[in-house]
Amino acid sequence: MGKIIGIDLGTTNSCVAVLDGDKPRVIENAEGERTTPSVIAYTDGETLVGQPAKRQAVTNPQNTLFAIKRLIGRRFEDEEVQRDIKIMPYKIVKADNGDAWVEAKGQKMAAPQVSAEVLKKMKKTAEDFLGEPVTAAVITVPAYFNDAQRQATKDAGRIAGLEVKRIINEPTAAALAYGLDKQGGDRTIAVYDLGGGTFDISIIEIDEVEGEKTFEVLSTNGDTHLGGEDFDNRMINYLVDEFKKDQGIDLRNDPLAMQRLKEAAEKAKIELSSAQQTDVNLPYITADATGPKHMNIKVTRAKLEALVEDLVQRSLEPLKVALADADLSVNDITDVILVGGQTRMPMVQKKVAEFFGKEPRKDVNPDEAVAVGAAVQGGVLAGEVKDVLLLDVTPLSLGIETMGGVMTKLIEKNTTIPTKANQVFSTAEDNQSAVTIHVLQGERKQAMYNKSLGQFNLEGINPAPRGMPQIEVIFDLDADGILHVSAKDKQTGKEQKITIQASGGLSDAEIEKMVQEAEANKEADKKFEELATARNQADQMIHATRKQITEAGEALPADEKAKIETAINELETAKKGEDKAEIDAKVQALMAAAQKLMEIAQQQAQAQGANAGQSSAKEDDVVDAEFEEVNDDKK
């Protein structure tokens, strides 16, 4: 069996790792970096991923997609999506099924389809390192992701050509990376994970019994729409407002300026983690009738902290809930681990330290720990890692809607997965022949305030007074945290089963279509690359031939020169087209036309060689004089 790689599919950056022998190793990408920006750009005839996509964002803001993880598995009408629509430079659109999709280059795409481009880059990075095809992966998700978001992440893996062996929670993966090589004793750790777009807290117990380590998640909580992107947006809004005060121009209407501002804001935020003050200096940010305008604004660390204080505070509430759910106090926590790039901010570290009453560990790389943990889990599933048992939990309660619009829970939040639960329900009316099973996820008593995961009908129930039929509903939650539901009429034995797919989400047919499109794009990308290579060869050939014509001078007969010029012009024309075979043919034609020129160039080279030989021979004829010292007294 091939390697199972571990992928941290992040909002801002992604990372891939693999077990190298018995040690997990983070793999550098083609640009030599250990993390890859989760940025995808669509240009004319090409899809760019990572740093190349990020570099051209300023000139192509509408077709450069970032922070797509904030949309994955979400409905267009979601409050969070509506907030993002106002601040994203690219178009977020409503799909036919009500999901939030994006539009680039006039094409509508599902979030999993776009995320698949990042996963493909991770897959290729691993394949280049391993020297063999990779088909299986463990992909991480925020612990607080719901069923639809987990399913959408699995879909992205499938579209990228990966069999997703396991979906694992990010804090759990970080705990695996941290706890695997720690010796001795049981410990209870808190993993505070503040990434680019999501926030999680997990309380995890690591037990060691006779050499076997058990990682048991006691509780988890979080906010799937809180992260570094929100911190960036606070900085962007501040800079825009300051510029408007100073110059009277609102940059929000200028996508190009906003893209430059986004980069500058992120850079300033990062600099303020180590410096007390930084300058945001953007010349020619915009222009009006009076001429070009420049931005030069000083930002202090204190100002940034004031801008984001409520965001940091917002992350502390889930900590209290997670501790209460685990039935623990802060004194029971042995180690605090920080994960996610945003935890490099001193204010975040200070607030977390104050909350837990202890300094967070500094021996965990916040950008790489999650991918490393995913690679370890890949090793566990492949049988390469023994003596490790991982017990994860479901972040939210699962149940069905019952009479009066009430949610009746079948599986409580923080239940260890995989798990199974069943409950017998009945009909609400006399002679009811069908029941609708409406599956929900969330903590509210009122069904309407919880996330609807989908619904299905169980039909063919025998007529009977209400309350008589016995309908058994079974919830089966797998190790990926994805739910399978069945309902059975105990009298007739009729059964209906579904794997939960929300009213949104991608159907198998849509995923298959996207897989095929990805394959077709692979072929198109290959053709594009071959065409680019052919054009480069044509350019080199034209340049070399023109250079030789100049060097040959009068030695090249006029008719030969005319023949070559015609061949060059034909190659120039072919080079502008899309036909590689035509370019190759015209390259051959130019080589044939330049035959005489090649001969002249060769003769000239030989003549030069001969001249050089003669001059060195002349130098060889010079005899070194022999000096003899003569004493004066011998004169």
UniProtKB/Swiss-Prot annotation:
Residues 601-616 have a biased composition (Low complexity). InterPro entries: ATPase_NBD (IPR043129), Chaperone_DnaK (IPR012725), Heat_shock_70_CS (IPR018181), HSP70_C_sf (IPR029048), HSP70_peptide-bd_sf (IPR029047), Hsp_70_fam (IPR013126). It comes from the Bacteria. NCBIfam families: PRK00290.1 (NF001413), PRK05183.1 (NF003520), prok_dnaK (TIGR02350). Induction: By stress conditions e.g. heat shock. This is Chaperone protein DnaK. The keyword Nucleotide-binding applies. The modification Phosphothreonine is found at residue 198. The keyword Chaperone applies. PANTHER family: HEAT SHOCK PROTEIN 70KDA. Belongs to the heat shock protein 70 family. It comes from Vibrio cholerae serotype O1 (strain ATCC 39315 / El Tor Inaba N16961). Residues 601-635 are annotated as: Disordered. The gene is dnaK. Keywords: ATP-binding, Chaperone, Nucleotide-binding, Phosphoprotein, Stress response. GO terms for cellular component: cytosol. Residues 621-635 have a biased composition (Acidic residues). GO terms for molecular function: ATP binding; ATP hydrolysis activity; ATP-dependent protein folding chaperone; heat shock protein binding; protein folding chaperone; unfolded protein binding. Acts as a chaperone. GO terms for biological process: chaperone cofactor-dependent protein refolding; protein refolding.
